[in-house]
């Protein structure tokens, strides 16, 4: 953290196809070794598959899936005396989105389909329908926070 001034957040330009900043952010998260065009190809291909399977606007389905994966609370480790407690804290809005994107990508990679487009499309459809591993991760995070609610007074 710099002492001089608050660092301004970098502006993300909207993606070329949907003119949406969240999709552009998702492309940036998916991108490996600076290959943005490959990331865009994967996402747009996945969106095409989602549109074919559900006959609905893929952007709307993607945003619904993202909302279903966003965590509200998480636990952070806090050391008090000799003990480490898992303290539940509310998640900031930008971190919610970042975690949801990361979980969607991670659990897409772990799926059994052949191509990344198919994996991502499958995970987006599952998340939009409130099932799948990314949604399970959010539920587990919420359960962990609920179980450690007794330590909420250690918040900082």
From Swiss-Prot:
- Tell me which UniProt keywords the record has, alphabetically: Ribonucleoprotein, Ribosomal protein, RNA-binding, rRNA-binding, tRNA-binding
GO BP terms, alphabetized: translation
* CC per GO annotation: small ribosomal subunit
Q: Name one Pfam family in it.
A: Ribosomal_S7
Family per UniProt?
Belongs to the universal ribosomal protein uS7 family.
Query: What task does this protein carry out?
Result: One of the primary rRNA binding proteins, it binds directly to 16S rRNA where it nucleates assembly of the head domain of the 30S subunit. Is located at the subunit interface close to the decoding center, probably blocks exit of the E-site tRNA.
Protein's name in the database: Small ribosomal subunit protein uS7
- Whose protein is this, by species? Anaeromyxobacter sp. (strain Fw109-5)
Quote the gene name from the UniProt entry. rpsG
């Amino acid at each position: 953290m710099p002492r001089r001034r608050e660092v301004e957040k970098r502006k993300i330009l909207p993606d070329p196809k949907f003119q949406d900043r969240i999709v552009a952010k998702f492309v940036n998260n998916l991108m490996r070794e600076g290959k943005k065009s490959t990331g865009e190809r994967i996402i747009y291909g996945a969106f095409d598959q989602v549109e074919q399977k559900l006959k609905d606007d893929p952007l709307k389905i993607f945003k619904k899936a993202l909302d279903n994966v966003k965590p509200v609370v998480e636990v952070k480790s806090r050391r008090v005396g000799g003990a480490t407690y898992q303290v539940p804290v509310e998640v900031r809005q930008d971190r919610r989105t970042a975690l949801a994107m990361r979980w969607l990508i991670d659990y897409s990679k772990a799926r059994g389909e052949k191509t990344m487009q198919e994996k991502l499309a499958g995970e987006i459809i599952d998340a939009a329908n409130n099932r799948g591993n990314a949604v399970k991760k959010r539920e587990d995070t919420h359960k962990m926070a609920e179980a450690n609610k007794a330590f909420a007074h250690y918040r900082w």
